[in-house]
Amino acid sequence: MAFVLSLLMALVLVSYGPGGSLGCDLSPNHVLVGRQNLRLLGQMRRLSPRFCLQDRKDFAFPQEMVEVSQFQEAQAISVLHEMLQQSFNLFHKERSSAAWDTTLLEQLLTGLHQQLDDLDACLGLLTGEEDSALGRTGPTLAMKRYFQGIHVYLQEKGYSDCAWEIVRLEIMRSLSSSTSLQERLRMMDGDLKSP
């Protein structure tokens, strides 16, 4: 979790360096939806993590993603977008619906989609000619590989209930870190606009 928090802190630092704000305002609703997504993930718990200790795994979030000097504003938003997109894809899988309460799952997918729409607007403002290359940059590619490892883990574990519980906890940690930082981002943006 520390490495995910470090990555997201790097995203905020880059966004609020000497150049100022991101150039896009995340709505207050964006943060509220993020909190709701976390509550939904908490409610989706079906097993005690104690029963799944043998299935624990370090998903090896890449440390090189926390190098602030490597990030530009568009890359930072792109990485955050990739995290939400991959989370959406993960829970949108056909096999995911067997593991969760379908009402909670649908609400989570709707919330993730709303957050992605907000970030799509930011990406549109921040990207120009570099748009096509963003998905191939180191940080975004590393995020894709991180989630690919999660997909492989689920396959290897036969999409078992314990495997899904471990993944739910991992995604909950990641989204928790991103939600906290998005709240700070909104507060900092408000401070920058104050007289």
Swiss-Prot record:
Keyword Secreted found: yes
Alphabetical list of InterPro entries matching this protein: 4_helix_cytokine-like_core (IPR009079), Interferon_alpha/beta/delta (IPR000471)
Top-level taxon of origin: Eukaryota
Signal peptide per UniProt: 1-23
Keyword Acyltransferase annotated: no
Gene3D superfamilies linked to this entry: 1.20.1250.10
Residues forming coiled coils: none
GO biological processes: adaptive immune response; B cell activation involved in immune response; defense response to virus; humoral immune response; natural killer cell activation involved in immune response; positive regulation of biosynthetic process; response to exogenous dsRNA; T cell activation involved in immune response
Sorted UniProt keywords: Antiviral defense, Cytokine, Disulfide bond, Secreted, Signal
GO cellular component: a single term: extracellular space
Subcellular location: Secreted
GO molecular function: cytokine activity; type I interferon receptor binding
Family: Belongs to the alpha/beta interferon family.
The protein's name: Interferon omega-1
Organism: Bos taurus (Bovine)
